[in-house]
Amino acid sequence: MATVTATTKVPEIRDVTRIERIGAHSHIRGLGLDDALEPRQASQGMVGQLAARRAAGVVLEMIREGKIAGRAVLIAGQPGTGKTAIAMGMAQALGPDTPFTAIAGSEIFSLEMSKTEALTQAFRRSIGVRIKEETEIIEGEVVEIQIDRPATGTGSKVGKLTLKTTEMETIYDLGTKMIESLTKDKVQAGDVITIDKATGKISKLGRSFTRARDYDAMGSQTKFVQCPDGELQKRKEVVHTVSLHEIDVINSRTQGFLALFSGDTGEIKSEVREQINAKVAEWREEGKAEIIPGVLFIDEVHMLDIESFSFLNRALESDMAPVLIMATNRGITRIRGTSYQSPHGIPIDLLDRLLIVSTTPYSEKDTKQILRIRCEEEDVEMSEDAYTVLTRIGLETSLRYAIQLITAASLVCRKRKGTEVQVDDIKRVYSLFLDESRSTQYMKEYQDAFLFNELKGETMDTS
C-alpha cells in the first residue's frame, strides 16, 4: 500500500526595510561649533568655512535669545561653497521648536497669488506662537470595566469604570460615547489611561508594572509604566506651538483647517491678519501665549524683483518679523525689473540693512573631507586612490559634479561585483557623464550640427 505524503509550501518571507532618501544636505546635523562658538574643522557634517560658520553661530545664539528678530543676514559666495549647507546647519541646530521656512527666490512668482502675498505667507510661517492651556485630566490604572447592555438589544449602553492610583480608588459612571471610546482603544484592566475632562479623549499610557507577570500574549511594543500616585483628578498644562500662517488659514474661511492639508490657502485678507495680530498681542499680555521669532531662508535671492525687495524693506521693520537669511551666488549684476546694476542683484537700500557673511572656495583638503562624508552618507566604500582622483575632479570641475559621481561609480562597482570603488570606476563614470566645461567644449566643436545655434562664430562666455 503506497503512502502519500502531503507537502505544504511555505511562502517566502521578505523583510521590508524602510528606505530613507538621501538628499544633497542630508549629512548635515548642525553647524559644528563648540560651546564658545568656535567652529571645529570637521563636525556635524560641516567642513571648512570657519569664519562663515562662526558668524552663523553668533546669529544662531541671538535667534535663541530672541534679540535679533527682524534682522536680515546675507550669505554670499561662489557656487558650491556651502551657502545652503550653512543655512541647513542653522535649521538643524535650532531644533524643531523654532520655525524654519526655506523657499527659493523664484517660488513667489505664481498666477494664483501676488508676490507680496507669497512673501507674507512665508514670513507668517516663520513666526511661531506657543499657546499655554490648562486642562483637567483623570489619570489612573483601570481596575475594572463593567458594561451593562440592555436585554432587548436596543437602547443605550451604560457602565462603570473603576480607576485607582497608589493612594485612592474611584468608580465613574460611563455613558454611551465613553463606552465606545474605551472599546475602540481596547482599554482593559491593568491599563494606565488618561481622560481629558473637557473633550473626553482617552489616551493609553501603557500597562501597569503590577500586570507584567500576567500570563497574557503581549506584543513587543507594549510599554510598562508605574501606577500613578496622588489624586486621580489633576490639572495639566498643555503647550501648543502653531505658526501665525496656520492661524491665518483657519480663520480665513469656514473650512479653513482643511486648507492646511490641501495647501489651497489662496490670498488671505489683511483684516483677518490684523485681528489675529491683535488677539495674539492680547494673549501675550495675559501670559497665555509666547511669540517665537523663527527663521525665513530665501535661497537664490537675486531672483526677486524690485517690488519684492521694496516689500522686504517694509516687512523687516514690522514688530512681528522673523530673522531673514538670504543666499546668493551673484556678483555685480542687474536688479530684476530694472536696468540698474547692484552688488548681488540686491538694491543698495536693502543691502544697507543686511549683515553680510561671505563664503570662500574649498581647499583640496576640505573637498576630500566632504567627499568622505558623502560616501559615508551614501554607504559607498572607496579606495584612497579613488578619493584622490575624485578630489582632483572636484577641484577642476565643481564639488557638486564630484558628489554626483559617487553614486554612479558605486553602481558601476557593483555591476563588476566589486566591494570598493576603484580609480577605474571613477574614470568610467567621468567619461560617461560630462561636466559643464566639457559639455561646453563639445557644443563649440559641433555647434553647426545643433538646431537653432545662436553662437555665430563668437567666443562663448561660460564664466
From Swiss-Prot:
It is an enzyme of class 3 (hydrolase). Transmembrane segments: none annotated. The keyword Acetylation applies. GO terms for cellular component: centrosome; ciliary basal body; cytoplasm; cytosol; dynein axonemal particle; euchromatin; extracellular exosome; Ino80 complex. Belongs to the RuvB family. One of its GO terms (molecular function) is unfolded protein binding. The modification Phosphoserine is found at residue 437. It is found in: Nucleus matrix; Nucleus, Nucleoplasm; Cytoplasm; Membrane. It comes from the Eukaryota. ATP binds at residues 77-84. GO terms for biological process: box C/D snoRNP assembly; cellular response to estradiol stimulus; cellular response to UV; chromatin remodeling; DNA recombination; DNA repair; establishment of protein localization to chromatin; negative regulation of canonical Wnt signaling pathway. The C-terminal domain is required for association with ATF2. This is RuvB-like 2. The lineage of its organism: Eukaryota, Metazoa, Chordata, Craniata, Vertebrata. Keywords: Acetylation, Activator, ATP-binding, Chromatin regulator, Cytoplasm, DNA damage, DNA recombination, DNA repair, Growth regulation, Helicase, Hydrolase, Isopeptide bond, Membrane, Nucleotide-binding, Nucleus, Phosphoprotein, Transcription, Transcription regulation, Ubl conjugation. The keyword DNA-binding does not apply. There is a cross-link at residues 9, 444, 456 (Glycyl lysine isopeptide (Lys-Gly) (interchain with G-Cter in SUMO2)). It catalyses: ATP + H2O = ADP + phosphate + H(+). Its main location: nucleus.
